[in-house]
Amino acid sequence: MIIGLGSDLCNIERIQNSLDRFGERFENRVFTEIERAKARRRPFTIAGTYAKRFAAKEAFSKAVGTGFRRGVFMKDIGVVNARSGAPTLALTGGAAIRLAELLPDGHEASIHLTLTDDHPWAQAFVIIEAHRI
């Protein structure tokens, strides 16, 4: 059963402006170490890499119905790759707690994430599915 759906569109130029203005302070506040390492491996597309991940965080916050309130912070939501290479989310802190609150008893969550970009836009969709254990 689908328990959450969220999407977000992020302007890559806006992320580039934040990187230019705030540098590592912005990176460390918003992105996980795994996300920062991936961006460093893509020096010519760093803003696009970050913009897709920023959009994913926003999309997840919409899918759980909180936005960035009620203890859900951007760094609690990390984009990682499954063994297949597909993007998914690793949750900690308030994001993990909020997802657990949404799950019916006897269910576990699967998070489906898709990312795309076409300069100057990056887009993410998140679907949260509950499966009976």
From Swiss-Prot:
It catalyses: apo-[ACP] + CoA = holo-[ACP] + adenosine 3',5'-bisphosphate + H(+). InterPro entries: 4-PPantetheinyl_Trfase_dom, 4-PPantetheinyl_Trfase_dom_sf, ACPS, Ppantetheine-prot_Trfase_dom. It comes from the Bacteria. GO terms for biological process: fatty acid biosynthetic process. It holds the Pfam family ACPS. Mg(2+) binds at residues 8, 58. Coiled coil: none annotated. Its EC number is 2.7.8.7. Its main location: cytoplasm. Keywords: Cytoplasm, Fatty acid biosynthesis, Fatty acid metabolism, Lipid biosynthesis, Lipid metabolism, Magnesium, Metal-binding, Transferase. Its cofactor is Mg(2+). NCBIfam families: acpS (TIGR00516), pantethn_trn (TIGR00556). Belongs to the P-Pant transferase superfamily. AcpS family. This is Holo-[acyl-carrier-protein] synthase. It comes from Erythrobacter litoralis (strain HTCC2594).
